Amino acid sequence: MLDLQNVNFGYSRHRKILSDVSFSVRAGASVGLVGESGSGKTTLLRLLLGLERPTSGTIRFGDDALDPADGAFMRRYRRAVQPVFQDPYSSLDPRQKVLDIIAEPLQSLRIAGPRKDAVAQALEAVGLPLDAMQRYPHEFSGGQRQRIAIARAIVARPQIILADEAVSALDLSTRIRIVELFKTLSATLTLVFVSHDLGVVASLCEEMVILEKGQVVESGKTRDILTAPQHPYTQRLLASIPRMPA
């Protein structure tokens, strides 16, 4: 579904952020991109969203190369691929009601159909009541706001969710509930989950890609990497990062 081959990215020859990144994401898979701050994982997510263009290398969605300059392709791609960002406090417009926030992709992607019905289905999927439509973000807790952000991501029925540190700004108990929500959604969607927290990825993703200083140092089945990490960087991550309950 997503295939990266020898992807490089940098702002100059002397400031390289990603080096020869190659991996694939199968349809229906849940894949964690794991690395510490500065590993390049958020930059990689920006490339996957089409917000940046690789310096070299290719990102493919199905049979097509991802080209941010191709407007027609990007409209199709953005319908198929939706993001969830880190901070539920800053990612929602406080001036808008929840109905308008969640419905935004329907409008921007020109998706026809009853707007309220689609929003109601998205709210139900994330466990929020229908009366949330007429309320504002400040009326909700952090966990509820992230549920609103997830509802916005799924309202257009995408094929892939790209989540960037989507639980790191939440308290532990809320984090566990949102991870469980992502786990439920991943049964019908492809999920790429960016996190510095190996424990979160271990509880959520069946596969993982480990990034260190812009390079893939290890990838494979999550259980295999956790059981027998091969790279010293992965071994250090496994030893130092607290794990969430499975």
Write out the residue ranges for each language-model feature.
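A short, proline-enriched helix->beta-strand linker immediately N-terminal to the Walker B motif
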Residues: 155-159, 188
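ABC ATPase NBD coupling module
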Residues: 66-82, 96, 100, 108, ...
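ABC ATPase "signature
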Residues: 219-220
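Conserved ABC ATPase signature
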Residues: 136-140, 144
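Helix-to-loop junction immediately C-terminal to a conserved catalytic motif
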Residues: 49
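Conserved ABC ATPase "signature" region
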Residues: 114-131, 238-239
